Amino acid sequence: GSEMCIRDRARAVNMIEKRFEELNERAYERGYNTFSDFLNIEEQSVLKSTYLPCVLFGGYPMAERVVAGFGDDLNGEKFPIVCICVKPLMQKFADELSHRDFLGALMNLGIKRELLGDIIVKDNCGYILCLEHIAPYICENLERVRHTSVKCEKSNLPNDLKNEPEPTEIFAASKRIDVVIAAVYNLSRNETSKLIKAEKVFVNSRLVTSNSYMLCDNDIVSVRGFGRFSFDKEIKTTKKGRLVLEVKKY
């Protein structure tokens, strides 16, 4: 069973690597930019391990799902990513809508997950980042989320979603990844090591499998099911030898 699993995973990884190599070759042979679909954190981890030159962007800083762009002179403007604002027609009669509700409504339209980036819910509106070519289809066909009638329009992300969150200070015994995650999310070390064992922890989009991995300044840590934070820096050591660390939770 588990051997089969490992073989299947290796085959899947191999296919993803090939796809990235093709995009890279096409960009440099033909002299134009090429772009992947949206990548989840595991796919980003595979991409990082290929060391191919590329730029990752998901429509705003710190997006979790990103598109890989290949070729020269790449900036955010060139990525084929659009933001759609989905808002209830009548807020006072609307259900309280969650990320899962918006994602479910899009899946019900038959839209593949890889065409969709992050979905951000704010003030009961959903901001959906998607590939440009699927945007008109979403705008024309997405009429309901749960039992709520909605309207869609292309929009920019609200400014406060584009901005970095405020830094917070945490106390930790060291910069080991299990210690820092436990401090950020108020977990026990035991719970944290289970998350690492279950391959749910990534640093800078690479899978981390060791509890004793030491974090460096500006590392971005993703914990499946909990969210992400940037580990900014060590501020000081207390008299009792504990570290005061600065992090930003996304």
Give the positions of each predicted feature:
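Short, small-residue-biased leader/transition segments that mark boundaries at the very start
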Residues: 1-6
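Electropositive, beta-rich accessory/interaction domains or terminal extensions
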Residues: 7-122
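Helix N-cap motif at beta-to-alpha junctions
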Residues: 130-135
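A common structural junction motif
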Residues: 142-150
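A basic, amphipathic helix-loop patch mediating RNA/tRNA/ribosome contacts
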Residues: 168-217, 233-235
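Short, charged beta-turn/beta-strand-edge "cap" motif at the junction between a beta-strand
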Residues: 208, 225-230
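Short, compositionally biased
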Residues: 229-250
